[in-house]
Amino acid sequence: MLYEKNADEFLPIASTTKIMTAMLVLERCDLADKVVIPPECADVEGSSMGLTPGETVPVEDLLYGLMLQSGNDAAVALAVHAAGSVEAFAARMNETCAALGLTRTHFENPHGLDAEGQGSTARELAVIARSAMENKTFRQIVATERKTIGGKTYVNHNRLLRDYPDAVGVKTGYTMAAGRILVSCAERGGMKLLCVTIADPNDWADHTALLDWGFAEHRMFEGNGIRYVLPVFSGRAQACAVVPKTAPRLLLRQGETPKISAALPRFVFAPLKKGQSLGTLTLTAPDGTETSVPLVCAGGVPFDEALPLSFPEKLARLWRLAGRALFSFNFQI
């Protein structure tokens, strides 16, 4: 978290609710699925795709209408298709909140129209958006400026896609009770920032300023080139290179450097497989933020049958044999 203000205040979040709706539909439905528009769509208020009960529309088209046009009718159609009813779908939304560890978010419907007890916090809405943005199809939809479906062209309500060069998503929201809500995401120089404001009448300007500040004052440290060497006993090589399984990344303020620490054994025994996990690499920012990745063997080291075993190797083998014997004995009991 780079900046926060009243991040845990529970508030209505209007159509940004549809971030969760789209995420669940993408998990449960195929894009090519055909949805028969249910009669419930005729009674939905607010922004609309203009769907007609009884017509058939693919899930993919409904998702674009949901996230670009903010169609409340699309939200209902998708909810009924995915779960059988709006109520059942809302229950799935709340189950997903629990799975994400969210304790101050509750949904009563899939579109975000005002409902008693429905809402979230800026912090938890950011968690939902971050989770949704992990889905490639979701990212593609929310980054789309306009989409023509059935002869109608829908323009994304997210103005930042046109006004902020690095914007890549995600969703606007508004009701009289909730005010203006905006969840935005922008990417620059390998760094992706997510911004959430609730009940902010100056959201476009505030998001532009916050994103500019975030990119100017922070950088993404990438731990490329980190490498360790461990002694190897009983191998055809006397040492093996150990590298991060994936390049570790940590967001830092400009001018900061991370603490780099590795949890590794003092030596290892052959045989070793390429990619075998040998330890953990941890990057720690000055504020205590951490990220960890596995450290793995960069190349395989086969066992050398011609080498005599050293005392530590004999001891290690005896220990392993004793462990297997103990396991076998316990298993027989």
Write out the residue ranges for each language-model feature:
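Domain-terminus/edge residues, biased toward the C-terminal soluble/receptor-binding domains
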Residues: 102-106, 114-333
